[in-house]
Amino acid sequence: MGQKVNPTGLRVGIIRDWDAKWYAEKDFASNLHEDLRIRKYIESKLADASVSTVEIERAAKRVNISIHTAKPGMVIGKGGSEVEKLRKELNNLTGKRVHINIVEIKKPDLDAKLVGESIAEQLENRVAFRRAMKQAIQRTMRAGAKGIKVQVAGRLNGADMSRVERFSEGTVPLHTLRADIDYSWVEAHTTYGKLGVKTWIYRGEVLPAKKENSKGGK
């Protein structure tokens, strides 16, 4: 089962949290579509800023957005000009008060989405797929990962038939729920069509927080 299911979704509620933190009964569909518009807009606007995750929280007419990026300076801009411009654009997009929080990713080589995007960018620039994958694996392991698995699928090197190539190093325990595994899937747009790049990074074990016993540990 662990080999098939999305590793992030499998661990939600155990060691991972939701990327959207809000609840709505009647407006659920409209809020969900608004979330999708926000994420799509941020990803297109900050395509070169190495954005990994966008977390959205809602409270009444206020939307709190946390942008996890490896290049916070590019997102914030000189004197905060760029982030203020982005906030105003999201205000107009949603019709609500938007607050933006920038979270810096200290080790981008341990982030599955950023590693996958790096491989995809090299594939689009006609770098040999084996070289791109092996270099990414070496950088990730040097950054302190316990294991990594990378998979590229499609018309590799312009071959007539599509195929799947995988490389891995270290251990990636997909069945262990306390294992902190970061997963991503990105696309590379080449002259021969699209290539799918999947990345699994094992960053060590995380023990779930124990709930305090209301009876004083008895």
UniProtKB/Swiss-Prot annotation:
PANTHER family: 30S/40S RIBOSOMAL PROTEIN S3, SMALL RIBOSOMAL SUBUNIT PROTEIN US3C. It comes from Ligilactobacillus salivarius (strain UCC118). Residues 38-106 form the KH type-2 domain. Part of the 30S ribosomal subunit. Forms a tight complex with proteins S10 and S14. This is Small ribosomal subunit protein uS3. Belongs to the universal ribosomal protein uS3 family. One of its GO terms (biological process) is translation. Binds the lower part of the 30S subunit head. Binds mRNA in the 70S ribosome, positioning it for translation. The keyword Glycoprotein does not apply. Pfam families: KH_2, Ribosomal_S3_C. One of its GO terms (molecular function) is mRNA binding. One of its GO terms (cellular component) is cytosolic small ribosomal subunit. Keywords: Ribonucleoprotein, Ribosomal protein, RNA-binding, rRNA-binding. It comes from the Bacteria.
